[in-house]
Structures are given as C-alpha cells and as structure tokens.
Amino acid sequence: MENKDGFLVINKDKGCTSHDCVKQIRKLLNTRKVGHTGTLDPEVIGTLPIAIGSATRFIQYLPQGKTYIGQIKLGIRTNTDDIHGEIINQKCWPKISDEKLDQYLNKFRGLIKQIPPKVSSVHVNGERAYKKSFNNENFELAPREVKIDELILMKWDQINGIIELKINCSAGTYIRAIARDLGEILNSEGCLLQLKRISACGFHEKNSIKISDIKKGIDQKNASNFIIPTISALNHISTLILNKEEDINFWQTGRAIKFDINYFNEGNNFDNKKPIKVVDKRKMLLGIGFLNKELTNINPKLVLNAK
C-alpha cells in the first residue's frame, strides 16, 4: 500500500485493548509509525481513531470531544466501577420518574469535578493507578475537572435498575466515574454495565471499519481507500495558503511567515493561541503554525518535509 499517512477509524471489538489494535495495524501496514488518539478500555466497543505515518504528529491538534452511549446498572458497586469488577457493595435503587432522574443528571452537566476510577491509567507518583490497585496499595486520586457538553437520558428501566445515557464530553472523562457517582447521588450504588464510543476526535462510527475488513482490503489491494487524509481531520482549524515558492521555502526551513490576512481562507478565525494549518496552493498540508503575540508573523510549530 503506497500511502500510509492519515487516519484509520477502527471499530474496536470488546476484549481488545487499544494497544492491541495499534499492534495489528503496524503489522498489517508494515510500518512502526502508528498511534491511537486515546485509550478505550478493553470492554468498551466503538470508535478508535488510529494515526499512521506523519499523521501521528497531528494527534494533539484534533478535536478533543468524545461521544458515548452507555448503560449504568444501579444497585451494584465494584472495585473497578464497571460490571466486570469485584462487587464490594449492593443496595436497592429508588423508585423514580424519568423527569426526576433527569433532574439528578443536571449535577453532571457542564464543568464538573470527578475522581477517576482507581483501576485506570491515571499516573500516581510515576505509576499507573491500575497497577497500584492490583497490588492492593492504598492511594487516593485527586478530583479532575472535565466538561460534559451533553448528557441525554435515553432510557430508564426501573424494574432492572438500568439507565441508558448519551454523553458528549471532554477528553479525560471517565464514564465509569459518572456511573459510580450517579449511584451515590441516588442513595444507591452504580457501575457501568456497557459502553460504546460513537465518535472521537472528529471521527464518527459511520466512518469506522473493523480490522478484519482492513485485512481483506490489503488482500484486494484497496486498503488505502480506508485511510482518511490528515488534512481532512483538521477542517476545524483555520487555513493559511502559501502560494509563493519563496514562502514555502521559508516555511520548510523553519522560518516565520509574515502574516497577511489575504493568505487565509475567507471566514477563518485566528489568534495567537489557536493552531493554523498551513497548505500550498494545491491544498497539500505543510504543517502547523501559530501567530506571534504581535500578530505579525506565523511561526512554524510542526513542519512536514522540513529542509
């Protein structure tokens, strides 16, 4: 396969780790330069964007929002905050209407503080929390601020104590923590029953593909059709077009470009804190830059094909 730069949107199966997916893609495409955009727990299914080749350098510039559909089981608390952990407490759940339950969900909308599950990849004194947990070490995790942009009650099964939610949230949000904390707020217990990620970093499940289908594509010589060009993943970023060879040469040798609003696509917003994608007149991606504080120059931050 000739073009190995861009993003593959994997539809991850249950039981497979994010790193397992990366290893399989490395082997299939015969390249070491592969990385995922954010870990999915093994039991979580759905959208896992994977960067290939030079696209790995652009992961930090992707949109950070993620959307999940999950089910929470009330009445059960586990040591992992999901149904697969060891049960540490059980408690009846309340009889409650959809309307009242939705009012409780207001506590999780907007900017909130949450304590990550102890079985998580959060670092504690240089070590992953899950390792400390498996070694039965005593430790505490500090609350972290996350943002829940959208929290929709999809279904409430009173008989079985199962809540189905759609959650649009910032990177770093733990849905398991929401399950645990919602159980406490309802004077019960709660754990995550199942979870599917339907979008991440600007990629949606409708564009995702099973790894088994990639294998078939390689056999049929059309696997490159599955790769999304890096520039297509950066549509949310303002675009600077360099038409002059002199400017392109300046850029590729790491020198600043004089800011000219005429170089920008119409309607673009810009300031010195937002990244700018730089392209040539053929719309080929050249890299990422930032305006200086004086708004006079665009300084290279990431340069493709540097000289």
From Swiss-Prot:
It catalyses: uridine(55) in tRNA = pseudouridine(55) in tRNA. The keyword tRNA processing applies. CDD domains: PseudoU_synth_EcTruB (cd02573). It is an enzyme of class 5 (isomerase). One of its GO terms (molecular function) is tRNA pseudouridine(55) synthase activity. Gene3D superfamilies: Pseudouridine synthase. Pfam families: TruB_N. GO terms for biological process: mRNA pseudouridine synthesis; tRNA pseudouridine synthesis. SUPFAM superfamilies: Pseudouridine synthase (SSF55120). The keyword tRNA processing applies. The active site is at D41 (nucleophile). Keywords: Isomerase, tRNA processing. Its EC number is 5.4.99.25. Belongs to the pseudouridine synthase TruB family. Type 1 subfamily. Responsible for synthesis of pseudouridine from uracil-55 in the psi GC loop of transfer RNAs. This is tRNA pseudouridine synthase B. The gene is truB.
